[in-house]
Amino acid sequence: MTRNAHVSLHDAIAEHVHDGDTVALEGFTHLIPFAAGHEIIRQGRRDLTVVRMTPDVIYDQMIGMGCVKRMVFSYGGNPGVGSLHRMRDAVENAWPAPLELVEHSHAGLANAYVAGASRLPFAALRGAGRTASARRR
């Protein structure tokens, strides 16, 4: 008997995304995973750490709906659309909840993804120590 490899998005989120989890929803322009983000919102997930190279409107919506506690990113903007208003509200006014930010360079976050995919605890990135990033945080 063959097993059905297909599962609904509702069931996938219910089974694999829990309060307090770390979630990365990547994709650019037409590949932004809006359906997955909206399903996370519908299921009322909370205290998530979200990771994304360039957070955009889907993460802004998740922040605005109170799903996100911490965001790891490398560029906090919404190219072509403008500011992330809910992200700004969360950082400046703790509304709807305080938001912890962890910022990396694009190269640093890309290397972190490579390390994770390789089941390694980190990836060495030459040159990151010679920037002002750590002093500016």
Language-model-detected regions and their locations in the chain:
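Conserved alpha/beta enzyme-core scaffold
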Residues: 1-137
